[in-house]
Amino acid sequence: MANQLVILNVYDMYWMNEYTSSLGIGVFHSGIEVYGREFAYGGHPYPFSGIFEISPGNASELGETFKFKEAVVLGSTDFMEDDIEKIVEELGKEFKGNAYHLMHKNCNHFSSALSEILCGKEIPRWVNRLAYFSSCIPFLQSCLPKEWLTPAALQSSVSQELQDELEEAEDAAASASLASSASGSRTGRHTKL
């Protein structure tokens, strides 16, 4: 299926906007929707991808502090769904969880990078205005705790990634144990499995 719409889903971080809207700065989370899937980025303390997937437009998957604001059609793409998965995987090497920075590498930077690849367009500037203003007003960054901006969906994704790594380690240990047991049985030892 070619010529798929590329949609920017924008979420209002309304609890923060109560404070920043009087300054004319909105604080938004964003993700890119294509092929009925939405990809976004968030921070965590680990050196693997911070990119995660949610149901398009579903703010509840991000957590109670987010609400859906609007969908912006950015263009269309001829990439197939498999290609997009590979692109997102490659972007995950750059957008690692521990590389997240509220002002310099946030969800909106990711959305813009993915959009540029898929349809050749950046996201609208108003979506990431906070990052722009923070470069002009450095103390602004210290006013916004980074941990407030880790979506619940990403926390779930990180937990799953860590669980997968734990299972892989357990499988490797079990395989090593079986190999050891197998070599032990050749030497006359009896091992109960």
From Swiss-Prot:
The active site consists of 29, 107
> Which Gene3D superfamilies does UniProt cross-reference here?
PPPDE domains
Q: Which InterPro entries match?
A: PPPDE_dom (IPR008580), PPPDE_sf (IPR042266)
Keywords noted in UniProt:
Cytoplasm, Hydrolase, Protease, Ubl conjugation pathway
- May I have one GO cellular component term? cytoplasm
List the Gene Ontology MF annotations in alphabetical order.
cysteine-type deubiquitinase activity; deubiquitinase activity; long-chain fatty acyl-CoA hydrolase activity; palmitoyl-(protein) hydrolase activity
GO terms in the biological process aspect are: proteolysis
Tell me where it resides: Cytoplasm
Q: Which residues form the PPPDE domain?
A: 4-148
Q: What sort of enzyme, by top EC class, is this?
A: hydrolase
Q: Show the ranges annotated as biased composition (Low complexity).
A: 172-183
Answer yes or no on keyword Cytoplasm. yes
Look up the domain of life of the source: Eukaryota
- EC number(s) given by UniProt: 3.4.19.12, 3.1.2.22
Locate the region Disordered. Answer: 165-193
Reaction(s) the record says it catalyses:
Thiol-dependent hydrolysis of ester, thioester, amide, peptide and isopeptide bonds formed by the C-terminal Gly of ubiquitin (a 76-residue protein attached to proteins as an intracellular targeting signal); S-hexadecanoyl-L-cysteinyl-[protein] + H2O = L-cysteinyl-[protein] + hexadecanoate + H(+)
What this protein is reported to do is described as: Has deubiquitinating activity towards 'Lys-48'- and 'Lys-63'-linked polyubiquitin chains. Exhibits palmitoyl protein thioesterase (S-depalmitoylation) activity towards synthetic substrates 4-methylumbelliferyl-6-S-palmitoyl-beta-D-glucopyranoside and S-depalmitoylation probe 5 (DPP-5).
UniProt family annotation: Belongs to the DeSI family.
Which PANTHER family does this chain map to?
A: DESUMOYLATING ISOPEPTIDASE, DEUBIQUITINASE DESI2
Could you identify this protein by its name?
Deubiquitinase DESI2
Source organism per UniProt: Gallus gallus (Chicken)
